[in-house]
Design a protein with these regions (language model features):
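Alpha-helical interface subdomain recognition
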Residues: 1-80, 99, 113, 140, ...
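N-terminal glycine-rich flavin-associated loop
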Residues: 83-101
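Short beta-strand-to-turn element immediately C-terminal to the catalytic PLP-Schiff-base lysine
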Residues: 96-100, 159-162, 171-174, 196-199
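A short, Trp-centered hydrophobic/proline-enriched beta-strand micro-motif
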Residues: 112-125
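A generic structural signal for well-ordered coil/turn residues at beta-strand boundaries
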Residues: 115, 129, 153-155, 166, ...
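A short core secondary-structure module
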Residues: 120, 144-178
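Flexible, small-/acidic-enriched active-site or ligand-binding loops
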Residues: 128-132, 147-149, 173-204
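Cytochrome P450 C-terminal beta-domain/meander region
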Residues: 128-142, 286
C-alpha cells in the first residue's frame, strides 16, 4: 500500500499548519485552559476556511476529499493543541451524512457552522458499543452519557440509543429542556462533560450500523491525535537538544540523547503509518475493526512513552508550564485513553483473532 502523501495532501497539511500557527498562539490556548472554555472565535475561522468539509461530499457542501485527508487535518490540529472539537464534529457530521433518514439534511448546517454536533456514546459501563439508553414512545430520552467531549459547548448531541432493540442515532438540542451538562476536569484540560437527559426531545436521524461506524472513525482519528501530540513533542525535543549546551556542547551530540530522539521518531512514524492505513481501509469501505484497533492500540501505547522521553531530554525545563511541552504531554495522554485504551483495542483484536484477513 502506497501511503506517500500526494502534492495536494502535502499542501493541505502545510496550509492547516500555517493557519494554526497564525491564529492559535499558545498564550491564547493557556487562557482557554484557565477558563475551561473552547475557542469559538477560532472555530468560526476554521469553518470559513473549509477545513471541516475536507471529508464531506460536494453535494453536502464539502470538498469531496477522503477520510485520509481528514486525518491529516486532525493531526495538524493535535500538533497545535487547539481547543476546538474538530474530531468530534467531523465524526458526528460523517455519521449524519451516512444516515439514511434525516441526517444528511443537517450536514450543510454542520459545514456552515450553524450546527456543532458532538457524539454522546459512552454510558455508565464506559465501554464503546454498550448502548443501554432507550428512546421512549414519546420521542424523548432519559438517561446519562459520560465523557462527552465539548458536550457543554456543542449546539447538539448525536446520542446513541436503542429504538426497538436496535442501535440508532438521535439528534438532541443541547439547549433544550431536559438537557443538563456537568463539566468535568479532564487530564488534557479539554472541555468534557457528563450529560443528563430528562425526557429530552430527540429526533431520530438514522441507524443501520451507524454507531459502530462512528466508533471506528473516531478511534482512527484519535490515533492521529496521539500522533500529532507525539510529533510536536519530538520536534520540540530535537530543537531543544540542538540548542541546550552542557559540558561545552549541545546535548544532542551525546549518544544517549540521540537514542532517545531516535526511539521517539521510530514510534511516531510507525504509529502514523498504522493510523493512515486504517483510514485508507475505511476510505475503501471496509469495516476494518482490526486495522483501526491496531492503529489505536499502537498510538495509545506509544504516546505516554514518547512524551516521557521528551521530558527526559528536557530535564527540569520540561516540567514548568511556561514550556509548551506540557500541552502535548497532557493532550497526548488524554487522547491515548479516548475512543478506546490500549486494553480495549487489544480486546477488539483478540475477539477477531480467528477471522481471515487480507493484509498479513
Amino acid at each position: 500500500m502506497d501511503l506517500d502523501l500526494s502534492e495536494t495532501q502535502r499542501l493541505l497539511q502545510e496550509t492547516v499548519r500555517r493557519f494554526l500557527e497564525a491564529e492559535a498562539p499558545f498564550d491564547r490556548i493557556r487562557k482557554l485552559e484557565a477558563d475551561q472554555g473552547w475557542d469559538a472565535g477560532l472555530w468560526e475561522k476554521i469553518v470559513a476556511q473549509g477545513f471541516l468539509g475536507v471529508a464531506f461530499g460536494e453535494a453536502h457542501g464539502g470538498s469531496g476529499g477522503r477520510l485520509l485527508d481528514l486525518g491529516l487535518v486532525v493531526e495538524e490540529f493535535a500538533r497545535r493543541a487547539v481547543m476546538v472539537p474538530i474530531l468530534e464534529v467531523a465524526v458526528a457530521g460523517r455519521a449524519l451524512q451516512a444516515c439514511s433518514e434525516l441526517g444528511p439534511s443537517r450536514v450543510p448546517e454542520v459545514l456552515a457552522g450553524a450546527l456543532v454536533p458532538v457524539p454522546a456514546l459512552l454510558e455508565v459501563s464506559d465501554r464503546f458499543g454498550d448502548v443501554q439508553l432507550e428512546i421512549a414512545p414519546s420521542g424523548t430520552l432519559t438517561g446519562t452519557k459520560h465523557f462527552v467531549d465539548y458536550g457543554q459547548h456543542a449546539t447538539h448531541h448525536l446520542v446513541a440509543a436503542r429504538d426497538g432493540g436496535q442501535e440508532a442515532f438521535f439528534l438532541v438540542d443541547a439547549r433544550a429542556r431536559g438537557v443538563s451538562c456537568e463539566p468535568l476536569l479532564s487530564l488534557g484540560r479539554t472541555p468534557v462533560a457528563v450529560v443528563h437527559y430528562a425526557e429530552a426531545p430527540a429526533q431520530r436521524v438514522g441507524g443501520e450500523g451507524g454507531v459502530a461506524a462512528a466508533i471506528r472513525l473516531g478511534r482512527a482519528l484519535a490515533a492521529l491525535q496521539c500522533v500529532g501530540s507525539m510529533q510536536a513533542s519530538l520536534d520540540q525535543t530535537v530543537a531543544y537538544a540542538n540548542t541546550r549546551e552542557q559540558f561545552g556542547q549541545a546535548i544532542g551530540r551525546f549518544q544517549a540523547v540521540r537514542h532517545h530522539c531516535a526511539n521517539m521518531a521510530s514510534r511516531v512514524t510507525s504509529a502514523r503509518l498504522l493510523a493512515l492505513e486504517a483510514l485508507s481501509a475505511l476510505d475503501r469501505g471496509e469495516e476494518a475493526d482490526v486495522r483501526v484497533a491496531a492503529a489505536k492500540a499502537a498510538a495509545s501505547r506509544s504516546a505516554p512513552e514518547v512524551l516521557m522521553l521528551g521530558h527526559q531530554v528536557h530535564g527540569g525545563n520540561g516540567v514548568i508550564e511556561e514550556n509548551d511541552l506540557y500541552f502535548f504531554t497532557l493532550r497526548g495522554k488524554e487522547r491515548s485513553l479516548a475512543w478506546g485504551s490500549v486494553e480495549e483495542c487489544l480486546a477488539v483484536m483478540a475477539d477477531r483473532v480467528d477471522e481471515e484477513v487480507d493484509w498479513l
